[in-house]
Amino acid sequence: MTQTAHPDTVLIVDFGSQVTQLIARRVRESGVYCEIVPFQSAEDGFHRLKPKAVILSGSPASTLDVGSPRAPSVIFESGLPVFGICYGQQTMCAQLGGKVESGHHREFGRAFLEVEKDCPLFEGLWSLGSRHQVWMSHGDRVTALPDGFEVVATSSNAPFAFIADEKRRYYAVQFHPEVVHTPDGAKLIANFVHKIAGIKGDWTMSAYRAKAVEAIRNQVGDKKVICALSGGVDSSVAALLIHEAVGDQLTCILVDHGLMRKDEAANVVAMFKEHYNLHLLHVDASDRFIGELEGVSDPETKRKIIGRLFIEVFEEEAGKLGGADFLAQGTLYPDVIESVSFTGGPSVTIKSHHNVGGLPERMNMQLVEPLRELFKDEVRVLGRELGLPDSFIGRHPFPGPGLAIRCPGGISREKLEILREADAIYLDEIRKAGLYDAIWQAFAVLLPVQTVGVMGDGRTYEFVCALRAVTSVDGMTADFYHYDMEFLGRAATRIINEVRGINRVVYDVTSKPPGTIEWE
């Protein structure tokens, strides 16, 4: 699906910061559409998007290095408002006649700004003489301002922490307003797009839904669409949106690989058939998948087997339907953003969903990707707009290879059943304790280790179950969830008493980094 037109767009020029996506999230949260474009193609992006405002991101680069990233001159010649963040401030000053020097030491962490001058960006937020927490992360610093700029706020280590040329509507900060450690940062960004750029903030999921439905109809016409429905939020929302647009021209195929959570496939099929009247084929291919996976211990080999078999099964089922012209995919905006290397050219990274990778080319189909402009949290809002229940929308992430990567070592039917039961009990206890929504992801892992235990009067030699729970904002970093010991004792007791094959339960207290959330 081609991207829909947005008359009020903010262009974010990405210089390679690890938190550029957070800038986009803050702009979107204020009801304004934005796109991230790497600095190498920013001029093309500027002409394509015709933005109402521009934000320049941070970067690990130094403006003092030869060949360091720069904003295209067309941005400063356009008369549009510009907001520079950290490196964005430095390159703005360097390009407009100011001076940037290497700092004697990096400034990283919490700092406090003092407002030196009233500024339109502070309206309803900060007042003259007030003091506010921000988050710094920089080495270089501005030491002389370009003509027309003045200081509006300072910190003890950054005399040019917040500068402005109000006549040209240029604003620039040395700190990071996009991160949660700058409490008023989201409001500053909202003030920039609303009060400075004059954008209304009427970009909503309701409006997106209407435009997306129209775009799908225009793209698909009277042709057939098939969708690989995994039971996850992304593919489910994509399927409902396409179904709203083209109705029975859509057929969904759920390939059950036998690696889902307890009763998951049956529950997904029931929900979509009973409540949404979708044409849905449930293909039980568990024997085929588990037969090939049995005894395989290498995690990458497991993933490759699952991906290959999925394509084979999906192709077979699509062939029985007589084929289709379009393949629906739940691609999200982070999947299609170009990753930026500030030392060389852009390297485009498009994550292929393990389920559908390679299918469009193999089956000679065009892609329909109605979610490719959205972040995950926006997909959840759209899902609610389409009528999906919160109990479904708010489910924890689940990996495409399913329980195969939560069963380290060789897989067997017996192990999968043991794991499935333990996982169901663990999640049940989390829900009973009212903790489910406070946790980003929770699951059980069946370890390829057996230990001696005593149950009744007998000796046991059974598997160890590890419990995992993490808190996170986006899955990029995570901390283990701090349960109280009473909860862990209760969950462990239930698992040992109710699941034959487990006689010991441990809790994983590893954060990410250094560990990953999943064990494989």
UniProtKB/Swiss-Prot annotation:
It holds the Pfam family GMP_synt_C. The active site is at 86 (nucleophile), 176, 178. The keyword ATP-binding applies. ATP binds at residues 230-236. Residues 9-202 form the Glutamine amidotransferase type-1 domain. Its EC number is 6.3.5.2. This is GMP synthase [glutamine-hydrolyzing]. It comes from Sinorhizobium medicae (strain WSM419). The lineage of its organism: Bacteria, Pseudomonadati, Pseudomonadota, Alphaproteobacteria, Hyphomicrobiales. The gene is guaA.
